[in-house]
Amino acid sequence: MLFKARTMTSILVGALLLSTAVPAAQAGEITSGLQIEAGQTFELGGGQEGGFTVTGKNNGPVAVVVLGQAEGKAAVERGTVAPGGTVDATFGPGEMALLRNTSRQKTARLKLKITGDTSSLGMTYSGNP
């Protein structure tokens, strides 16, 4: 009977560890030396299950506008990151982060860290409106 009790305890502990590991697998960290060409917007996320946070520094020569866009909604400006300035913006589940280069001539450069639900973040570029 002692063997069965230990086996059952091992199974329960294993199941508990597995159930706590699944949410942890969704959390992650991405570091990026991001470049955004003149007249372009970097689009991050949209449709993901959890939220994420973007932190970092604008180490380029031009300002970058940070916006958030919930699914089916208009983009909402969160602020502008001047050259040498920092960004710390949190985006909710399903929300997209938009980082817009304000220049039509120069490339924007940022050093970013993205934390939170990074497992399914899409990344693409689009032309500025």
Predicted regions, residues:
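Asparagine-centered strand-capping/turn motif at beta-strand->loop junctions
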Residues: 54-62, 99-103, 114
